[in-house]
Amino acid sequence: MVIGCCSLRFYLHGNNSLKGKRRVVRAIKDRLKNDFNVSIAEVGNQDVLQSLHIGISAVSSDKPYMDGLMTKVINAIDKINLADIVDYKTEILSMSTDNY
């Protein structure tokens, strides 16, 4: 089993309301859920209006597929162009299922 995790931090230019931040989060979530089979959650900076931190995860049986999926997800978010990606980190974890 291969687990892909990605942590992304964004800067929201000109945002001054929680409503505006939620709109950006919802747009990113909706786009990714429609295009990719991933789970998404806002994981930090929830009280900072111009900062957004989301986590994305997916599970597969193939490491090369997972590497490609995480790259495609990051590129798709960048193309949405609702916020600037300040930083991101991707990890691919392998878990043995032989003992089950």
What function would you assign to each model-found segment?
Residues 21:
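C-terminal binding/interaction regions
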Residues 62-100:
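C-terminal structural segments of small proteins and small subunits
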Residues 38-44, 86-87:
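A short linear hydrophobic-aromatic micro-motif
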Residues 3, 41-61, 94:
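Short, charge-patterned binding micro-sites
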